[in-house]
Amino acid sequence: SFSTKKFVELLYDYSTAPNGYYREIHRDSDSRTLVFLIYLNELCEGGSGGELNLYKYNKTNDKIPSQPKKEDCSLIKSIPPKTGTLVAFLNSHDSLHSVSKMENHSNLRHFLYGSFTLLGKKNTFLDKSDGKLKTNFNIFE
């Protein structure tokens, strides 16, 4: 709502993903409001995987789990890792996504991952040495 101020912080991480890298279907932490991914390179020809996959949860009467079973989801879109591609989405309880397993690539998948994250949620803590708010961000949490 526009009547309540919420403080957010931009958190980002440069990462690489080797052969064998994948992420199961999941949704991000509730503290992340807007999530983005920027692909920095293309993967070699002849390999497979590395796509960001977006899903819809099929069970209408159930609460959506943070890591639903694949058989309970339908693939909406698959986005290949191409240089300069920016993917962004509002994070919510139904923002389900995965990364398909990378196989037979001779190079790494380079990308920036980030989010606008609400302060005061699980990604934050108060540093006892100086009393200032610090953040802890890790793409693989």
Predicted regions and their residues:
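Catalytic and substrate-binding regions of extracellular carbohydrate-active enzymes
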Residues: N138
